[in-house]
Amino acid sequence: MKRINIVLSGIMLFLTLLLSFGMSWGNKNFTSSQNVSSVQLAPSLAPMLEKVMPSVISINIEGSTVVHTSRLPHQFQPFFGHNSPFCQGNSPFRNSPFCRSNPNSNSMHEKFHALGSGVIINADKAYAVTNNHVVENANKIQVQLSDGRRYEASIIGKDSRSDIALIQLKNAKNLSAIKIADSDTLRVGDYTVAIGNPYGLGETVTSGIISALGRSGLNIEHYENFIQTDAAINRGNSGGALVNLKGELIGINTAILAPDGGNIGIGFAIPGNMVKNLTEQMVKFGQVKRGELGIIGMELNSDLAHVMKINAQKGAFVSQVLPNSSAFHAGIKAGDIIVSLNKKTISSFAALRAEVGSLPVSTKMELGIFRNGITKNVIVELKPSLKNSVSLGDIYTGIEGADLSDCSLNGQKGVKIENIKLNTQASKIGFKKDDIIVEVNQKVINNLNDLKNILDSKPNILVFSVKRGNNSIYLVSE
């Protein structure tokens, strides 16, 4: 019996110690969990977003565009309309209705609805910035704020070459504007937050980092100097905000690389500094009045540097300086390498073009020039464009895709097609590079102002008389 009592006493002592240890371990573990939770508590973007979201708007577009469709089988088309051999040269049929119109195609106005995003940048004036491709061909623009308020909006200015547009909300009060950050200070790896209206869902937020800076060569816009981010950007995000963790605007979301139509983590935004420079011109002039450096150039790569025996790896190689241009008067020469602009490194010709393309006429800037192994700085004042080139879409929203300039060649005045983009309204009408518009609706065109005055009257049909080489043809837009 005594032996049993001893055993029982030992068991009770063991259980007491075990229970005591378990309680002690449990309390210690509970305390440790509390400490870990407090340390690992993730920061939230909510406070920043609460400040930023009221400045981001959803945009609803009602518009129309001209659609050209063929009435004849492809094999018969060469025998009809202005391209027919019966309509060329001194043919007696050249000015007939048969040749003046294009019986091969039907033209019709097709209505459409589109969605996009925008960002309020001036609360007092109710100005918001978005992409040009969001509002082009718009007949009606309606915006919705984060608090549900809706307003009509009108276009203040737009620029198809950079894909930036400035709109104004009508009769809008008590708005919240975003601050535009200095995008020149951005670094690869900085955190980004994209805000917009993808697929019409309304306010949507995604996050990521800056994957690359100064992206170009994408053939999305004429002036390309994109911020690349892996923050998810989808359809409807165009024109929306790309912000930093302070809630400052660093870019306007513009495009994605999407082989299958969806986000794969490669999105592009127009830098905030370019947005600021262009919208300031739109407020002042109603359009972008670019200065021109007056050079022709190319990217500097290792092969070119080796052949030219240039001790430089990055920059904009100057292959030609146009007479009487800004570059000419600053002493820039063919063979020079432009390596900086206002002390900011220039890594490519595309980057130089984008930087200069956002600056207005009469801007003075400092260029770093590498020549004969020595870098020196020169001051350049931007002159007006020698070609006075503008986008046809900027003066007439019904036809996009052609760059125009005043022309006077061998006594023939008119408006010259400097460039043409494939699969645009201008190319479908039939315009080609180097065409010269000499008449519209039987009214003589001597310059861009003449063309703009006729297009501003918004006629139901446009019959363009065009000089193409030694031939005269007619192109029709209905």
UniProtKB/Swiss-Prot annotation:
EC number of the protein: 3.4.21.107
Top-level taxon in the UniProt lineage: Bacteria
Region entry Serine protease, spans: 116-254
PDZ domain ranges (all copies): 281-372, 387-469
Residue numbers annotated as active site: 133, 163, 238
Reaction catalyzed: Acts on substrates that are at least partially unfolded. The cleavage site P1 residue is normally between a pair of hydrophobic residues, such as Val-|-Val
Subcellular location: Periplasm
Record GO terms (molecular function): serine-type endopeptidase activity
Top enzyme category: hydrolase
Keywords: Disulfide bond, Hydrolase, Periplasm, Protease, Repeat, Serine protease, Signal, Stress response
Pfam families cross-referenced by the UniProt entry: PDZ, Trypsin_2
TM regions (residue ranges): none
Disulfide topology: 87-99
Principal cellular location given in the protein's record: periplasm
Annotated substrate binding sites: 236-238, 293-297
GO annotation terms (biological process): proteolysis
Leader sequence residues: 1-26
One Gene Ontology cellular component: outer membrane-bounded periplasmic space
Functional summary from the UniProt entry: Might be efficient in the degradation of transiently denatured and unfolded proteins which accumulate in the periplasm following stress conditions.
PANTHER family hit by this protein: SERINE PROTEASE FAMILY S1C HTRA-RELATED, SERINE PROTEASE HTRA2, MITOCHONDRIAL
Family that this chain belongs to: Belongs to the peptidase S1C family.
The protein's name in its UniProt record: Probable periplasmic serine endoprotease DegP-like
Gene (name only): htrA
